[in-house]
Amino acid sequence: MKKVFCFLLAFGALLMTGCARGEARLWAVGVGKGDAILIQNEDCTVLIDTGKGYAAGKLRRAMAEMGVEKLDAVFLTHVDNDHAGGLTYLAQAGIPVDAWYASPCFFKFKKKKHPIRQIGQEPQWLEAGATVRFGETEFQVLAPLSKSETEENDNSLVLMMVCPDGRMLLTGDMEGPEEEALLQSGADLACQVLKVPNHGDDDATGAGLANAAEAQIAVISTDSSEKPGTPDAGVVARLEQAGSQVWVTEGHGGVEVRLNQGAAAAGYLDWALSEFYGDVRLAVDAETERMTLENTGDKDVSLKDCYLYSEAGNELFLLGDEALPAGGQLVVGTKSSPEGTYDVLWNEKNVISNKKQDTVTLYDPEGRGVSAY
């Protein structure tokens, strides 16, 4: 495994695995234009948002690199797919989660259709002023202060993590209106680490926020190929003028920040990707909702931790420990497929959209597309 770290502030020799005593770590996983933020210290290991469904392999790998096998909590800042899409992966992979937290403000669906409830879990709704505690670590809920009926981004949970080593401000996709309300509230936004709102887009992170935070490290999670113009040059300039070093996940496995006794240091996370051995082709029969995986090579292929993803419906199916023999096929059906016509059941209906163009992709365990149809 290769990891590259370019630390800004040295605080001694740091172990590259595990969590050293007396520090907090933040990993902004490189999930494209989305958020999946792992935070770990002696008190807890939590996940803030889950990225898009198709990036599940990238989240899986980051959790493995961090040694995370269970989560004390998942905080879902808001319901947009680039933050909530990976919930299905967490559920299907069987990763233990002690508690689920969410913003009570959203308008896209009724509460019974909230993404956390869609995976069979019950969220605890966090109002501004609430605090979630793990030992000496607190997650203070600063926003939303009111419900937006026009922009889900402005319904984002905004959290301040406060621990013995310092403060991290976690802002979801907060845009200008929520940002202004937060500034007007008089909340103390000073922090060592800022997770920059809304992927560094130009609709957030004004000078007021940059100066109020005055963070040592500002982290932007985005991919300009998915969201051109991010990070916005003006956003980066305002952060730098406020004294922040800006780190962007694009092109890397992620960004790691370590916080120790008020000093923050950042570096890029990069690791050698495992090879996917085999030549697997995907074919889809949309009418019967059957997806056929065919091994066209001359060696058996393991499908462990591979997954299928339907783009239009944002649906994900994690394959099991199936081995696909050379020249063999595996047929995946859904609850809409005729009984007895498939080998493995994707336990959902209407996975493939018949209302708009859909693409189903087979992804390998690292989150790389293998075959699409």
Predicted regions and their residues:
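Non-globular, low-confidence helical/coil segments that flank catalytic cores
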Residues: 2-3, 7, 16-277
